[in-house]
Amino acid sequence: MIGNPPYLGYSRQDEDQKEDMKIVFSRINNYKKLDYIACWFYKATEYIENKNAKYAFVTTNSITQGEQVALLWPLILNKGQEIDFAHQSFKWTNNAKGNAGVAVVIIGIRNIDSSDKFLYNQNLKQSVKNISPYLTNTSNVYVSPRTNPLS
């Protein structure tokens, strides 16, 4: 499954889109700050679970940064899935009127297996052991906000 779902941050969603989010994440707390595209990732994750299938989306890079990572990625990676390949952030432009361009990433997801994973950046293709939700060659660690200092 491949696609280029709509990019809408939580503050730019209309009432219908907020209702979509509520339906998709009905069993999940803390979803309201997720970008709209998180719906596609979550539904695709459910769709390929325990199947011989993969999915990939072009998405804004926001789901690989900040609060989005700790909110979205455990929902995917804790279902026995992993990032199969990823193209790190690059500027996407098209011929649309008023197109300002946006920083995007391309992320492919699969059920966990032992085959190679690839990380792309411009003209570089790197075979890696793991691709983290931050699209780096590291383990899956999540940085979450805190209300109290560490010490």
Give residue spans per PLM region.
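Signature of N6-adenine DNA methyltransferases within the class I
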Residues: M1-S151
